[in-house]
Amino acid sequence: MQRIDHPLPWSHLGSERTLSVFRYGAGTRKVYIQASLHADELPGMRTAWELKKRLAELESQGQLQGVIELVPVANPIGLDQHLQGSHMGRFELGSGKNFNRSFVELSTPVAQLIGDRLGSDAEANIALIRQTMGQVLDDLPAPASQLEGMHRLLLRHACDADITLDLHCDFEAAIHIYALPQHWPQWRSLAARLRAGVALLCEDSGGSSFDESCSSPWLRLARAFPEAAIPPANLATTLELGSMGDTRVDQAQANCEAILGFLAEQGFILGQWPKAPDECCEGMPFEGTQYLFAPHHGVVSFLREAGEWVEKGDALFEVVDPLNDKVTTVCAGTSGVLFAIDRGRYTQPGTWQAKVAGREPIRVGKLIND
């Protein structure tokens, strides 16, 4: 195992933050795994520690067939943000920016540099594109902030990967994944191993999130150069490992073994591993997800559990105004999987309370919430 420590730029006087990468194995193929980019989403970090131990063991046994890079703490900035006893890990407090938005878009500068050098050899194209992605990131002007510097380091390690896992969670949720529709056939095994509730599929959710910054450039390049052989060569996903409180030992170990079993299936680990379950969740268009909001201020009482299938018109939660004796029941506007609910129980208009993944598209434009 090799430990790589990257000091982040623009640290405050008298302090320094470091992004640590743990590199296992050797070879031409690569997996990149990071956890807790939203720093208060800790099931991924706990799972990453299980992975760290198991990968060291597998490496010592000579079982790894390729490189696996692991970043257990992908956001040391957000890990250090606490306000009056509450961890604030989703947004950078100084700028208000979401830590998982606005990553560098690589396809345009890559196309400008190598468009005339792409041909019919897919493997040669993959190698050239990956090399150029790294060059583009290395040649950018110095980062203007610590957040920008951290973003570049994360993307620099992931841009040449064959498989990228970005480990997150939701407030109270079933396990679910976000991915490209083109990659869903490959992800079905991991979803089944994790017993995920749903997969949300789209090419562009509108936020330049980390996983899409790894996977979507390949689609854009393939469309820009239709005569060239350009496969979607970075299999990237945002993997939501359930609820914010899902950090029990058994949960982390189960997540770890599911991920390792998937990587073994993909040829990165030798040995005997359990076969993926036959039963798997549905892959649904992210355009089919409904966000449900409270119509007024009040206390929320949820009537259904995260992970349940609900029908259009089913009552999902009540909002109670105890001063004016006003009670409003909010119902599902689409049939699908109630895959996440808010953790807060006092709400206001404009704050989402529940998410239902449906089979039919009902939204356009920006799909992801901040």
Locations of the language-model features?
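Structured catalytic-domain cores with a bias toward divalent-metal coordination
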Residues: 1-370
